[in-house]
Amino acid sequence: MRYPFWRLAVFLAACVAPVWWLYQAWIFALGPDPGKVLVEDFGLATLVMLLITMSMTPLQRLTGWPGWIVVRRQLGLWCFAYVVLHMTMYALFILGLDLGQLGVELVKRPYIIVGALAFLGLLALAVTSNRYSQRRLGARWKKLHRLIYVILGLGLLHMFWIVRADLKEWALYAGIGAFLLLLRIPMITRRIPRLGGSAGTGSKKVQNNG
């Protein structure tokens, strides 16, 4: 395993937010509606983790350090873990585990459908984020994992629909997402010398395994 301490550091850092929020809920420090706070916090954390995951490839190309790619899959799985926690909090505190209420919620809040589609996309990526799936799917694996761009769009739309009264924070995340997408365009990449240059043999070895 390459960069074990770096992997461990990323793992511990990703644990901090959920552990802290759950602890805050345990000691009743999240205000009068802790369930709503947890749903919102885990939802936002999912979007942030998705953006962090998408930034690994540009960072590797910019710096030439393969460590960014090494933790990309780990970060992607953390993104999925966050969205599972987001949906779990929603089922517990908003629905009260009453699936009959879900139909009412879907009619009143159609942005939930958008969020559910994003979840299904993340589920597909999480299930196939292993070497067996890479070998099994071949060239189709990369095409499947381009779903991350669609998922980002769905996540931003989901957030926009919820916070449209105050779009300042949304605009920040949307701007970061747009910037990361621009860095994927070959014409843009070639205009930035470091991004267009060779990333080194070490990074090539971990490109598909990170």
From Swiss-Prot:
Protein keywords: Cell inner membrane, Cell membrane, Electron transport, Flavoprotein, FMN, Heme, Iron, Membrane, Metal-binding, Transmembrane, Transmembrane helix, Transport
Cofactor(s) in the UniProt record: FMN; heme b
Predominant location: membrane
Gene Ontology CC entries for this record: plasma membrane
Note describing how the cofactor binds: Binds 1 FMN per subunit.
GO BP annotations, alphabetical order: protein repair
Membrane topology value: Multi-pass membrane protein
A molecular function GO annotation: electron transfer activity
Transmembrane segments annotated in the record for this chain: 8-28, 37-57, 75-95, 110-130, 147-167, 169-189
Keyword Amino-acid biosynthesis recorded: no
One of the Pfam families matching this protein, by short name: Ferric_reduct
Cell compartments where the protein resides: Cell inner membrane
Subunit structure: Heterodimer of a catalytic subunit (MsrP) and a heme-binding subunit (MsrQ).
Functional description taken from the UniProt entry: Part of the MsrPQ system that repairs oxidized periplasmic proteins containing methionine sulfoxide residues (Met-O), using respiratory chain electrons. Thus protects these proteins from oxidative-stress damage caused by reactive species of oxygen and chlorine generated by the host defense mechanisms. MsrPQ is essential for the maintenance of envelope integrity under bleach stress, rescuing a wide series of structurally unrelated periplasmic proteins from methionine oxidation.
PANTHER family: PROTEIN-METHIONINE-SULFOXIDE REDUCTASE HEME-BINDING SUBUNIT MSRQ
Family designation: Belongs to the MsrQ family.
Protein name, UniProt field: Protein-methionine-sulfoxide reductase heme-binding subunit MsrQ
Gene: msrQ
